C-alpha cells in the first residue's frame, strides 16, 4: 500500500498540526554552543519550512492557540500585578516602561526608515525582544484593524517573517549582552550582590539546600540548669541562640507543650526541633544529660506547606515582622511570580507571595491562618472559573470605542489578558476559587503558544524565500539595535537616574525582557540569587506591557504617515 504523505497531511489538519509540533519540539532541543534553540523557534522553523510546501491549517486553531496563551500569561501575572503596579514597585515599573517603550519607539523609527509595512515592523519588534506576547498582541490587533483581506494576509505573513528572522538574533544578542555588559561598567556585580546581602541580611547562596527540621529529645542536666539560671523560656530566647526551639517537655511523667513562662528543671526531658546543622551545633549544655528516646515526646508530625500571603496584617510587612520562629515554624523558600527569592528579613511581602514553611502541623496551620492560606495540594483545575473568565475576556475584547472617523477596539489579546489577571488576582485572595495547578497552567500556556507558532509559520512559509532576500540584511541590523539599545538605555536610566544597586538592576533588566536564560547568566556572574529580586519585580508587569506594545505599534503606525 502506497501512502502519499503530502495528501495525508493536507487532508487532516489535526495530524498536520501535531506533526509540526513534534518535529518542532525535537528541533527546539538542539543547541548552538551554549544556546538552546527553544520550543518556540523550533516549531516556527518547521512550520515555515512546511508552509513553503503549501501546507496549511485552519486559522481557528491559530486563534485558539494565542487566546489560551495570552489568557494564561494573565493568570500567572495576576497575583503580583497590582502590588507591583500600585505600591512598592515604582522603580521596577519605570524600568519596564523604559525597556518596552524605548524598544517600541526604536522599532517604529527603523520600520519607517527601511520602508517596511506594519507586519514586518511588529514582527521585528517581537522577535528582537524574544517576546511572543508582542507577536500575539500585534496579530490580534491587525485582525481587528479593518484592513482589506489581501492587505491583512500580507501583513500577517510579514509579521511571522519578521519574528522568525529576528528571534535568534534577539536571544543570542541578549545572552551575550548579559555575559559582557556587567564587565563594562565600573561596579563589580558580585560586590553589589554582597553589599545588598550585608544591608538586608540576605542568604546569597543560589544553591542553598533546604532541609526539613528534625526533632530530638534530651534530658536536662545540671549544666543546662546552671546555664538557664532560673530564667523562663521567653527570657532565654533559646531559638536565637541555638536555632532550635523547645516543642514539648516531660516533667514527672507528664507531657506538656510549654509556654514562654516555663522554667527548665533538673530531670526534665525536652523535645528540641531544628534543622540538622542546628542540632549539630548545640552547646554541650543541652546534651550533657543524655539523648533520650520517648515515643510520646517525639510524636510530632513535621509538615512542609506553601502558604499564600493574603491577609492585611502580612501584606506590606517585612518578612522579619512575621516572627515565624517565635511560632515554631521554619522558612525554607520565598517565591514571587514563580521566581525563588533570597531569604531576606527586610523583603516586603506582596499579596500572592508564596512562603514555604516547615514545622509542626498545628503550628504551620496557625501561621497560615494568620497571614493567608495554605495552597491547595490538588491536581483538579477549577474549569468553571477558567471558562467563565475566558468568556469575560472575549466579551471585553469586543468593546469598541468610536472617535469621529476613527474606531479603536480593545481586541481579544487585551481582553483575555485583563480577564486572566483578574482570575489570578482573585485566586491569590480566595483559596478555594479558580485553582489551577501550576503544571496544568504551564501545559495549557505552552500548548497554546506552540499551536499559535505552528499556525503563523504555516501561513507565512510560502513567502519567506522572497522576504528573506529582500529584507534579510536590514532585519539583522534592526534586530541587533532593538535587542541591545533598549537594554543600554534601561541600564543608564536605572544606574544614574534611579541609582539602583547593580545586582538588582541587572536582574530587573532581564525581567523586563522576560528572558530566563539571560537571568541565569546574571546570577552566575553575581554568584548569588540576589538578582532574582529584581527579575521578579519587573517580570509580571513586563509581560503585560509587551502585550500592550504589540497592540500599540499597530494603532500608532497609520498616524506616522
Curated annotation (Swiss-Prot):
> Keyword annotations for this protein?
Cell membrane, Membrane, Repeat, Transmembrane, Transmembrane helix, Transport
Q: What is this protein called?
A: Putative transport protein CKO_02260
Entry's localization field: Cell membrane
Give a single Pfam family match.
TrkA_C
Q: Which GO terms describe its molecular function?
A: monoatomic cation transmembrane transporter activity
Q: Which superkingdom, per the lineage?
A: Bacteria
- Domain RCK C-terminal, by residue range, is 200-288, 292-373
Q: Please name the source species.
A: Citrobacter koseri (strain ATCC BAA-895 / CDC 4225-83 / SGSC4696)
CC per GO annotation = plasma membrane
Q: Which residues cross the membrane?
A: 8-28, 32-52, 66-86, 94-114, 158-178, 383-403, 406-426, 447-467, 475-495, 540-560
Is the Transport keyword given for this protein?
Answer: yes
Give the lineage.
Bacteria, Pseudomonadati, Pseudomonadota, Gammaproteobacteria, Enterobacterales
- What is a biological process (GO) this protein takes part in? potassium ion transport
Q: Family per UniProt?
A: Belongs to the AAE transporter (TC 2.A.81) family. YbjL subfamily.
Topology class, membrane: Multi-pass membrane protein
